[in-house]
């Protein structure tokens, strides 16, 4: 009887198992029916993963260029892979992982390098914005620290220069008078991305600075201590690359000495077009830094890394300060470092040098006296009309010093990079644009078109600027400009 009972129980278990198997299918499993290693073409490629399973599974390891249509599921399914075109000459690979409770499989995808790409030739140029056939203000933009793969049509080089161009015009009065400008790009290949840290382009070293050398076209370098924003490059090479643009070819190639002083060539002729042109060097580095080198003849190079800092320390804000403010506007800084009077000599700013530069029409955003009839000429119409422009007056402190030097408004782009040129700054820029375009400026025209700039004034509030930086961040003023060719 006992044996019969045991036999019946065993038969019952077998029946249950059989029923279970017939209702639930086979044991849990996961298989990949397609290839687990495959290669695709550089363009117009696709792929798939054929999953055979009766359990839940996931797919991980997606990249920007190789993405599965789903990242999880259950049961059998063919998962399509989206594979973007390879826009470099270099092959690339990705590994996707299909995993479940029953194990995992690696799917290895490789893509060929693209041999069909067209790269800009070294030293070539492109006219990207032609608003005038004659009497235009010229802007030449080039990049440093961009390798050959970046130099495709619409590639990283073009995208960076596009950002620079739009940033320059994204402020009044440049926005309103954009149709007075022509813009050109010049292409240069670097062997490495980035910029040099801790060395000047001439190979000189700096102290207390983490050093890293990059082989770049224009030898852009961050040249001072770790907390400095000072920047340099091979100025002579930049000037002569700008001359690759046909309209810039007046005169002979430029020769500078080791300190950047003019020796010969176009830059020594005050009437040469190089001295009426804005040159922007976009540096392919994320550091917050930037410097403008300004020549007494009018030439300039604004050096701007592609800062990833927020707010008024961004790439765009830095470029507007360095290029629009220093380079085109020829303005002095308005921030304050020292709680003392502007010295008569020595340092980056002093009264003697300021007076000399103002004598040739530069640094007219600051005043050495707080007396109306001694203020720069571009201040005069504002001071004469306090009802229309009540914000303009004498505010002590500029050029890194708290006393003995005055700015025209409480705040402006030359203080903390805020997107706002104050009244006298904007009027100077307007007059320069009109003059370089062989047109006659007038106070009446400026006022008639000034409403858009006035609306930007609300952005000049320092509290608003600070809030835009984010919690715990403090605005860092940019290094003073480099002055070459001091007036005698």
Spans of model-derived segments:
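Bacterial Sec-dependent N-terminal signal peptides
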Residues: 15-37, 101-103, 108-117
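Extracellular/luminal low-complexity segments enriched in Ser/Thr/Pro
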Residues: 70, 78-93
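A short beta-strand micro-motif common to beta-rich folds, especially ectodomain repeats
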Residues: 90-102
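Sec-dependent bacterial lipoprotein signal peptides
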Residues: 1-20
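Active-site-proximal segment of zinc-dependent metalloprotease catalytic domains
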Residues: 120-135, 142-146, 166-338
């Amino acid at each position: 009887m006992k044996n019969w009972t045991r036999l019946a129980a065993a038969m019952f278990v077998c029946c249950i198992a059989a029923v279970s198997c017939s209702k639930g299918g086979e044991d849990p499993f996961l298989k990949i029916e397609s290839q687990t290693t495959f290669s695709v073409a550089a363009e117009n490629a696709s792929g798939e993963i054929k999953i055979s399973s009766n359990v839940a599974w996931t797919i991980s390891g997606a990249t920007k260029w190789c993405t599965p249509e789903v990242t999880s599921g259950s049961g059998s399914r063919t998962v399509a892979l989206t594979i973007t075109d390879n826009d470099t000459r270099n092959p690339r690979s990705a590994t996707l992982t299909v995993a479940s409770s029953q194990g995992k499989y690696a799917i290895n995808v490789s893509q060929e390098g693209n041999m069909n790409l067209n790269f800009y030739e070294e030293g070539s140029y492109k006219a990207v914005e032609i608003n005038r056939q004659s009497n235009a203000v010229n802007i030449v933009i080039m990049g440093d620290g961009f390798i050959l793969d970046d130099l495709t049509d619409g590639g990283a080089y073009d995208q960076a220069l596009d950002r620079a161009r739009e940033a320059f015009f994204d402020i009044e009065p440049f926005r309103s008078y954009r149709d007075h400008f022509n813009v050109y790009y010049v292409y240069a290949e670097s062997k490495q991305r980035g910029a040099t840290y801790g060395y000047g382009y001439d190979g000189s070293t700096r102290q207390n600075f983490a050093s890293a050398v990059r082989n770049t076209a224009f030898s852009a370098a961050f040249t001072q201590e770790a907390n400095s924003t000072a920047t340099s490059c091979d100025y002579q090479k930049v000037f002569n690359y700008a001359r690759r643009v046909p309209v810039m070819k007046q005169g002979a190639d430029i020769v500078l000495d080791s300190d950047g002083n003019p020796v010969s060539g176009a830059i020594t002729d005050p009437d040469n077009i190089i001295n009426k042109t804005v040159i922007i060097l976009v540096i392919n580095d994320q550091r917050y830094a930037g410097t403008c080198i300004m020549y007494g003849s009018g030439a300039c190079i604004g050096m701007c890394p592609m800062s990833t800092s927020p707010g008024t320390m961004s790439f765009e804000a830095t470029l507007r300060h360095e290029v629009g403010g220093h380079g085109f506007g020829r303005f002095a800084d308005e921030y304050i470092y020292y709680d003392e009077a502007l010295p008569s000599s020595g340092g980056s700013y002093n009264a003697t040098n300021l007076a000399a530069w103002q004598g040739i029409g530069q640094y007219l955003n600051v005043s050495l006296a707080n007396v109306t009839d001694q203020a720069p000429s571009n201040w005069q119409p504002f001071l004469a009309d306090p009802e229309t422009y009540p914000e303009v007056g004498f505010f002590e402190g500029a050029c890194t010093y708290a006393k003995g030097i005055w700015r025209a408004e409480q705040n402006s782009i030359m203080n903390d990079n805020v997107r706002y040129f104050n009244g006298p700054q904007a009027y100077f820029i307007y007059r320069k644009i009109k003059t370089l375009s062989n047109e006659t400026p007038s106070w009446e025209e400026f006022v008639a078109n000034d409403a858009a700039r006035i609306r930007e004034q609300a952005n000049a509030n320092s509290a608003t600027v600070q809030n835009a930086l984010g919690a715990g961040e403090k605005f860092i003023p940019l290094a003073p400009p480099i002055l070459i060719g001091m007036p005698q």
